[in-house]
Design a protein with these regions (language model features):
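Short, structured beta-strand/loop micro-motifs enriched in basic residues and often containing a Trp
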Residues: 36-48, 92-101
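Short, well-ordered loop/turn sites that connect or cap secondary structure elements
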Residues: 52-54, 59-60, 109
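Ubiquitin-like/PB1-type beta-grasp interaction modules and other compact soluble beta-rich domains
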Residues: 56-58, 79-81, 93-94
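Short, conserved beta-turn/loop elements at beta-strand boundaries and strand-helix junctions
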Residues: 64-65, 71-77
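Helix-rich interaction surfaces within compact, conserved domain-sized segments
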Residues: 89-120
Length: 120
């Protein structure tokens, strides 16, 4: 397994769970980088992007695993700069900052859980 990006959830904004339930999406952002957005995002520890995230890679959120089916054109740069992307679970999307994922259900979000992109 080749780990490409691994971070730990440090805070979950009040609207972040609503976005997951209603839009099947989670907005990730480095901890403290944009305090004005903290209510809408899942903040995480800083992480190093060791390899570009690509279609076919895997994402693990806690014990839930997903397959990357599409990577927006801005995702890898945004992750390098601000730890930012939008994860879309079992839904369609086409925005440049989105990672589209397929798997069972939606992840459980909690502080301390790892979010890991990897290649098998």
């Amino acid at each position: 397994m080749e780990t490409k990006y691994d971070v730990t959830i440090t805070a979950i904004g009040g609207l972040a769970r609503t976005f997951l339930e209603n839009n099947k999406s989670v907005i990730l952002l480095d901890e403290g980088i944009r305090p004005n957005l903290s209510d809408m995002v899942v903040e995480h520890s800083g992480g190093l992007l060791a390899g570009e995230i690509k279609k076919g890679d895997k994402l693990r959120v806690g014990s839930s695993e997903y397959t990357v089916t599409s990577v927006g054109s801005d995702v890898n740069n945004n992750i390098k700069e601000e730890g930012h992307c939008t994860l879309v679970f079992n839904a369609e999307g086409s925005m440049p900052g989105q990672v589209i994922l397929k798997g069972k259900g939606q992840p459980v979000l909690a502080s301390g859980i790892h979010i890991t992109f990897y290649k098998k």
